[in-house]
Regions:
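Rossmann-fold dinucleotide-binding core
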Residues: 1-74
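Interdomain hinge/lid region at the active-site interface
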Residues: 59, 63, 107-174
């Protein structure tokens, strides 16, 4: 950003969330970092791609927001995976458990979308484990630089590493549940 600014131009970092579905539907969440005036100039272009467009702050803050997003998504996927695995191993029907949870405080987009993938065993990639693993690596490297402990993020990164080590890096990140299933010697559901 600094080099571009020195040349007399503006720089915006603008990572997105919403995956392939959001891109096709022009409903991406766009997290922008950079100067206000530059943001306002290009906002009409962002509006062609997304619905939730936020100028988070200065240069780099868009990327920081994206990494924070990836932390939340990873931890929620792990939580849904653990909950459904626990329920299934205890003998409950994971589909009915998910249905019940969707009506309460535990309801979330992750439970809705990725919980269903875990139950139906549909791990076709929307966002690949390998890419999410890279993002968590950025989070952990940034945390080290900042002197911040992110123990839950480190745990989720380890689960993704287990998946990658077992050839699952190209599956959807909801397949993180497979690492939990390997440790429990139990699958949430049968295909």
């Amino acid at each position: 950003a600094k080099k571009i600014n020195e040349l007399g131009a503006d720089y915006l970092d603008a990572p997105v969330s919403g995956g392939e579905v959001g891109a096709k539907a022009a409903s991406l969440t766009i997290m922008v970092g950079g100067p206000d005036a530059a943001f306002e100039r290009v906002k009409p272009l962002f509006e062609l791609m997304g619905k939730n467009i936020t100028l988070v702050g200065g240069n780099g803050d868009g990327q920081t927001c994206k990494v924070a997003n990836q932390i939340i998504v990873a931890l929620n996927i792990a939580a849904v995976g653990e909950a459904l695995l626990f329920a299934s191993k205890a003998g409950a029907d994971p589909a009915k458990v998910r249905q019940a949870l969707m009506g309460g405080f535990a309801s979330s987009r992750i439970l809705e979308v990725h919980g269903e993938r875990m139950i139906k065993r549909t791990f076709n990639p929307g966002f690949r484990i390998g890419l999410h693993q890279k993002d968590l690596g950025l989070a952990l490297a940034g945390a080290r630089t900042l002197g911040v402990a992110l123990p839950q993020t480190a745990g989720a990164a380890q689960l993704m590493q287990v998946c990658s080590a077992n050839g699952m890096q190209d599956l959807d990140h909801s397949a993180l549940v497979r690492a939990l299933e390997l440790m429990a010697n139990h699958e949430v559901a049968k295909a």
